[in-house]
Amino acid sequence: GLGLSVHGGFRVVTEGAVLAMPETGIGFFPDIGASYFLPRLPGAIGMYLGLTGHRLDAADALYTGLATHFVPRDGLEGVGDALADNPGDPVDVVLNRLAGRSPVAGSRLAEVRGDVDWAFGAPSLGEIEKRLRHLDTAWAADALATLESASPQSLEITHALLARGRQRTLRECLGAELALTRTTIRTPDFLEGVRAALVDKDRTPNWQRASLGGRTLPS
């Protein structure tokens, strides 16, 4: 997963890649060091991904920097041989030879980057909501609906973690996540989120607090 691969120097995706941190939808928060690497993505992309769990394809992964190289799926088996056959060549040069035409130009996230930065760069969850409503676009409506369906507790935890994560070391971020995990897994929202998503699979969690639309979150 991302928690391991993001720290590697070479992060390869294929045309079938899907990357996401969907934890707020099950009453949890992005962990495995996400509070360290998400705030270090360009602009407010990390906050957007952490709060909404938006799914990235290969083009988006390359655009955000979560992936460094693209190799077609049918070329993956040849990566090891190509590296072994060209021991004097830098790894990135070998990977680029295998890439063919990179899909990065097709990033859908790049198309809404300005709106992402403006809305999710807001200082509070309440302000993020206001800015999304102000935008009045299909992307903003989708993002707002996702937030309103997520656990309010998880959104608050995630926003706070990511806001502080930029100033923390990886060790500090992992420590904070571990401490929060020990308490969060005992909360009603986590149990309800797991029930709705993984056990009964009815996708209708009954969170303990009102939704984002109920305006109970910090403003």
For every predicted segment, state its role.
Residues 1-49, 63-64, 79-83:
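CoA-thioester-processing core
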Residues 4-5, 60-61, 158, 197:
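Hydrophobic/aromatic residues within transmembrane alpha-helices
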Residues 54-60:
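Acidic, divalent-metal-coordinating active-site segment for phosphoryl/phosphodiester hydrolysis
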Residues 66-150:
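Amphipathic alpha-helical blocks and their helix-capping loop/short-beta junctions
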